[in-house]
Amino acid sequence: LAHQVLHAKKMQSEGKEFKPIYGIEAYFIDSVTKWKEEYEEVQKTKKNRKKEGMSLAIEDETATKRQEKNILNRRAHLVILAQNQKGLSNLFQLVSKSFHPDNFYRYPRMDYEMLAEHNEGLIVSSACMGGPLSKCYWNNREEGNETVQKAMVDTVERFQSIFGDRFYCELQWNSIPEQHEINKNIIEAAGKTNCRMVSTADSHYPTPDTFKDRELYKQLGWLGASKPDYAEDILPQRREDLKYELYPKNGDEMWESYKNYSKQCEVNYDDELVRESIKETYRIAHERIDNYYPDNTVRLPDFVVPDGSTANQELDRLCDEGLREYGFNSKSDYVERIKQELQVIKDRGFSKYFLTMKAVSDEAKKTQLVGAGRGSAAGSLVAYVLGITGIDPLKYGLLFSRFLRKDATDYPDIDYDVSDPMKLKEFLIKKWGENTVVPISNFNTLQLRSLIKDISKFYGVDFTEVNKVTSVMIKEATPAAKKAHG
């Protein structure tokens, strides 16, 4: 995400005809188990080489640092596309497993064993210059073409044994000389293994003319980091200055890139093979990938509903207990309010959601302090008598409709504070399982005010001057930015 400024909304605003496909570019290694064994051995070696002296830990790095670095970086990129609904499910499984503590170190990792277990419905290609076939070139080029070819053929056959004809060798076109050495070796290995090829373009921005935006955005990421100060001339000023073009291309544009870069690098290819690889890319998208959508159905836990009961019945029972506990069962206004709220909750099918939130709240209270709740959930009498919140909405004149409307389709937010969120998360995982408890992910966007200041810093504009005009710039730029980027 750090250098990615392309998404479907921008593609649509540019008037592009395209088909979005669910997939990932994963970090792949041959064997997570073997990698872990080697890594643990390196860590043991490092530990044994540390010597205590003068209250300092002195380390002899000469025999371990390079080896450790190689092990940490022993990974390759792999493009994995979901072919159908089953494939999407398997893709989710792979991503989840790659983030498991057993497979995660700095990066999520997956290996042949994981791919074999969840291969159904997936299409895989060998990715870019950081892919597994490219690694065969980088790791063996000093030993000659024969060694490179053997490694590539072995790797292709290993993937074919898992995915069959759903594995593709991937070609890319740019002005980097090594890319063409890799391409030639991939073409040779694909011929030996009867593996189909695709031509692809790494895509990081929507149109050719927006490369400056991406390059500037990339440089902003280094502001304040331990990198040398960048001057304005670090940014490429012309498309011709780029070693590679990172925007989506149609078939004609891919062919043009191939012809231009192969001529520029003085490399001869079989035109028919390349033309077929471009067509194959189209076939994958429009013939091999089904039209499907992620199943966004919310699946709440069943254990909150006792055997022989329904979610509605259990919610009624708990609310009745809560009314009696607080002494509200004899107060007509409270009884009427609880009936109204329960009717809305049941009509929307949210009973199990409230039972789940009560279960989480109850578990939290066993180990730590829990706040009274905040936000519109404080307007729910049901939440109060269940013990989810600690505020009586009738006492303070709080409206249930601010929390949950009769026509609501999404679950309402119920926010409450706990003294130790991480401890609660660990407790819930231990009680209910790591496959059923996940934190919420947040994606933050750059705000215009901070973006103006970062860009000004990059160009060396004094902050006092920037502050004088920031408000005016925001007022003038916001409408245009929203129109351009959504």
What are these regions (language model features)?
Residues L1-G486:
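Alpha-helical scaffold/interaction cores of sigma-54-like transcription cofactors
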